Amino acid sequence: MRKIKRNDEVVVITGRDKGKRGKVTRVLPDNRVIVSGIQMIKKHQKPNPQLGVAGGIVEKEAPIQVSNVAIYNPSTQKADRVGFKVLEDGNKIRVFKSDGNAIDA
């Protein structure tokens, strides 16, 4: 089970976007995540008339290391760490380390 999943709200803890918040749009297999509005890069796109793509400079999100983000805890309004807890029925859930509340409610 991963600590950071798709649609989690995260805070960037290191790098040029430190302190910014965003939603995880994709989790890549090499321990990287794509967060909306974070790590924006400019890509020089060639026009492709067959696909209907216009050329120019396109801004898009680049992947960021999962170790450089922390999950956002809405109750404390701060970045938090993720822990795991096994319920009595055998299911494993993610919890916030600071207060023990379940992330996947």
UniProtKB/Swiss-Prot annotation:
GO terms for cellular component: ribonucleoprotein complex; ribosome. It comes from the Bacteria. SMART domains: KOW (SM00739). GO terms for biological process: translation. InterPro entries: KOW (IPR005824), Rib_uL2_dom2 (IPR014722), Ribosomal_uL24 (IPR003256), Ribosomal_uL24_CS (IPR005825), Ribosomal_uL24_KOW (IPR041988), Translation_prot_SH3-like_sf (IPR008991). SUPFAM superfamilies: Translation proteins SH3-like domain. Keywords: Ribonucleoprotein, Ribosomal protein, RNA-binding, rRNA-binding. Coiled coil: none annotated. Belongs to the universal ribosomal protein uL24 family. PANTHER family: MITOCHONDRIAL RIBOSOMAL PROTEIN L24. One of two assembly initiator proteins, it binds directly to the 5'-end of the 23S rRNA, where it nucleates assembly of the 50S subunit. One of the proteins that surrounds the polypeptide exit tunnel on the outside of the subunit. This is Large ribosomal subunit protein uL24. It comes from Teredinibacter turnerae (strain ATCC 39867 / T7901). The gene is rplX.
